[in-house]
């Protein structure tokens, strides 16, 4: 017999990418034809080595999603009201938000966006702000003798030959790099 979520329910699930537990809250449940159909799920800004305890419910906060190109907003979506295997009910508390969403998902999620957001929050704030600013910028920079937008996301040394990997700092949004040869300072991290 399937277990259905109720508004206010808080669930924990093991996030295999984080190797920790994460949590979500059901903020509302919609019925269709007299049956629970959709649960609105809100990701919570919580992670731990063991499942959340009922005593911790009062301290929970929503997880805002703003990693990379996302504009800051609540990380929430609608999915089936049937609670999937692996999700453990911790308790029930008043929904943390009253907003609704028009985002739908085919399942409760595997925690990938939560993982990406929590990893994003580990990046120093100065770097995150530089990324966000560059992503929206029309500014250009000179690189390898050519002019490029500072928001450049990918680069290949096949088309843009350069000597020193430190030159890549010109592109705060660079997230894909294809190299065919060794470049000076490739392993320097700062």
List each model region and its residues.
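Short coil-to-beta transition motif at edge beta-strands of beta-rich domains
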Residues: 2-15
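Short beta-strand-centered aromatic/proline hotspots
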Residues: 20-30
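Short, solvent-exposed secondary-structure boundary/capping segments
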Residues: 32-43
């Amino acid at each position: 017999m399937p277990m259905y979520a109720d508004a206010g329910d808080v669930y924990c699930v093991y996030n295999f990418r984080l190797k920790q537990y994460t949590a979500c809250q059901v903020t509302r449940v919609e019925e269709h034809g007299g049956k629970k159909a959709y649960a609105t799920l809100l990701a919570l800004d919580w992670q731990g080595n063991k499942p959340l305890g009922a005593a911790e419910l009062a301290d929970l906060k929503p997880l805002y999603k703003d990693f990379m190109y996302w504009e800051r907003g609540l990380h929430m979506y609608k999915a089936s009201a049937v609670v999937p295997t692996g999700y453990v009910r911790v308790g029930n508390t008043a929904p943390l938000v009253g907003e609704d969403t028009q985002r739908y998902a085919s399942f409760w999620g595997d925690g990938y966006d939560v993982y990406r957001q929590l990893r994003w929050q580990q990046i120093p704030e100065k770097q995150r702000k530089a990324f966000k600013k560059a992503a929206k910028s029309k500014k250009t920079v000179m690189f390898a003798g050519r002019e490029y937008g500072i928001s450049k996301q990918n680069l290949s040394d096949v088309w843009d030959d350069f000597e020193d990997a430190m030159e890549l700092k010109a592109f705060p949004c660079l997230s894909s790099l294809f190299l065919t040869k060794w470049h000076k300072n490739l392993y320097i991290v700062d």
